[in-house]
């Protein structure tokens, strides 16, 4: 469960290393975001000499959360960290690689480009 002020790792090579959630896209009074939700975040830590710099406001899609994800078949998936992938306005990733495992639910949410770049889909 991601809420405003939550720090997230970045799971791509866009140049950002750490994000802080500042808003959840969707309903105006949503409190938490889960896997597949789009958030507005600020870059707290970035790699030098890359297109994305510190204190930039970006959109990101959440790909991993520490909170369990319950599937319809009874399976429960939990990750070790909270992570997101930086995206543009059309929903395409800004980086060219995605690191770590990605949940299968992103495919149903039309983030197929992120799923195709991921090394492992759970």
UniProtKB/Swiss-Prot annotation:
One of its GO terms (molecular function) is large ribosomal subunit rRNA binding. PROSITE patterns: RIBOSOMAL_L14 (PS00049). InterPro entries: Ribosomal_uL14 (IPR000218), Ribosomal_uL14_bac-type (IPR005745), Ribosomal_uL14_CS (IPR019972), Ribosomal_uL14_sf (IPR036853). Keywords: Chloroplast, Plastid, Ribonucleoprotein, Ribosomal protein, RNA-binding, rRNA-binding. Its main location: plastid. The keyword Ribonucleoprotein applies. The keyword Nucleotide-binding does not apply. Pfam families: Ribosomal_L14. It is found in: Plastid, Chloroplast. One of its GO terms (cellular component) is chloroplast. Binds to 23S rRNA. Part of the 50S ribosomal subunit. This is Large ribosomal subunit protein uL14c. The lineage of its organism: Eukaryota, Viridiplantae, Streptophyta, Embryophyta, Tracheophyta.
